[in-house]
Design a protein with these regions (language model features):
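Active-site-adjacent "subsite" loops/lids of carbohydrate-active enzymes
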Residues: 26-28, 32-34, 38-50, 110, ...
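Conserved, mostly hydrophobic/aromatic
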Residues: 30, 59, 67, 112, ...
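Hydrophobic h-region of N-terminal signal peptides that target proteins for export
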Residues: 8-17
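Sec-dependent signal peptide recognition
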Residues: 1-7
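Glycine-rich, proline-tolerant flexible connector loops at the mouths of alpha/beta enzymes
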Residues: 69-94
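Extracellular/periplasmic catalytic domains that process cell-envelope and extracellular macromolecules
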Residues: 22-27, 60-61, 113-114
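Anion (oxyanion) recognition and catalysis
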Residues: 106-109, 113
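Catalytic domains of carbohydrate-active enzymes, especially glycoside hydrolases
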Residues: 50-77
Length: 160
């Protein structure tokens, strides 16, 4: 009798677990495209767009449906901002707008949406300067509000 009761309890638990599970309509299959690895430095806007187009095409072929695009690495921006300077990872010099002008984030939004992909902007919220950055733009927070940063071993970090 105990064995029969145990089997009934076990089977009822399995059926309840199966009934509670509802598969998701869609999975998040994302890829991160970063700017800090130097892959864009020295590129013209046209070359950067070609590189990004190739990356998006390959990722789409592999079933990626979301892109996480790094747009703020060191309190600088890969998009038009009234607050943050242009990123050195875009032009090679922080604070310098791309020539010819283009907005990488806006361009990525358009390209991802053409492919039916989501796009998410990735920011580094506290990193203000790495050791590799030697010049800061005049409107960089470490120059305009130095009191909001602390320095450690050549790095600047925003003080939350």
């Amino acid at each position: 009798m105990r064995i029969l009761l145990s089997i009934i309890l076990l089977l009822s638990g399995l059926f309840q677990a199966e009934a509670a599970y509802k598969p998701h309509k869609r999975e998040f299959r994302g890829a991160w495209i970063q700017c800090v690895n130097g892959q864009f430095q020295g590129m013209s806007p046209t070359d950067m767009q070609k590189t990004l187009t190739r990356q998006l095409d390959i990722l789409q072929q592999y079933g990626t449906n979301a892109i996480i695009f790094q747009v703020r690495a060191e309190c600088d921006a890969l998009y038009k901002s009234d607050i943050e300077p242009w990123s050195k990872y875009l032009t090679g010099r922080q604070g310098q707008a791309p020539t010819p002008y283009w907005d990488p984030l806006q361009w990525m939004v358009e390209q991802c949406h053409k492919r039916g992909m989501e796009i998410h902007a990735w920011i580094n919220p506290y990193r203000a300067k790495t050791k590799g950055t030697t010049e800061l733009a005049a409107n960089h927070i470490a120059r305009t509000h130095r009191e909001r940063c602390f320095e450690y071993d050549g790095l600047y970090v925003l003080n939350p």
